[in-house]
Amino acid sequence: MTRPPKYGTIARLAKALPGVHETFYNGPWFKVGKKGFALYWQSTESWIFKLPQDQQMMLFDARPETFAPMRSGRILWSYVEVENLSTAELRDFLTSAWRTVAPKNLQSDLRMKGN
């Protein structure tokens, strides 16, 4: 497998969030418990983030060159063209995606750290 774009940066930022671990299924997945929030799908060579729905809809309209819808059953994920994002933007979007799956106690831990 070739290394996904910005893998090192994404792995570092994702693993800095409370409770995150990495697994592998057709590419790296970043999860809290059994719930994924960011993954690289090798067959489509795409990063996919689980962003909040209201944020997704805004991004699909405002930044279509970077964000596109990806539906899995009833769940809407976002294809993310990570090369178009700065490290600060990646951190913000990964944190937003993480919040969609992280339990409240872990979210409190992050708030206590000032994020």
Task: Label each PLM-derived region with a short phrase.
Residues 1-115:
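Charge-dense, helix-prone N-terminal extensions
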